[in-house]
């Protein structure tokens, strides 16, 4: 199994999620983040260095996470790349990591079986 972590512009999220759902991605997590550091240009938005808080609040970056079978990782990663690429700085990054196991809390299913859609969902 693999985990895809894609850091993309917020404006791309809906089309990425829609397409990954069409491709039957087993589960998608979206997290809004505030990046600091690598790849960030201090004056990208024209603010002075002392305006650090204001500068970071304008970055619209979202992390998309998908855990999937090895056979699907290239297809899902390419879908994200294709939909988010403008050819400009700030398009984002995709990271792919190995996942040693997955365990469904409800019934103890493990591995790829845990990634399949559960038959029923009940929240207590």
What do the predicted segments below correspond to?
Residues 1-124:
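Positively charged, small/polar-rich N-terminal and surface patches that mediate targeting and assembly
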């Amino acid at each position: 199994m693999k985990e895809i972590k894609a850091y993309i512009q917020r404006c791309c999220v809906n089309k990425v999620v829609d397409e990954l759902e069409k491709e039957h991605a087993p589960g998608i997590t979206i997290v809004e983040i505030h990046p600091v550091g690598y790849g960030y240009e201090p004056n990208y938005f024209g603010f002075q260095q002392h305006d650090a808080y204001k500068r970071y609040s304008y970055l619209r970056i979202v992390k998309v996470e998908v855990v999937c079978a090895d056979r699907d990782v290239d297809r899902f990663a390419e879908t994200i790349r294709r939909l988010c690429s403008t050819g400009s700085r700030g398009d984002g990054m995709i990271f792919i990591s190995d996942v040693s196991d997955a365990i469904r809390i409800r019934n103890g299913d493990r591995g790829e079986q845990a990634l399949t859609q559960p038959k029923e969902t009940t929240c207590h």
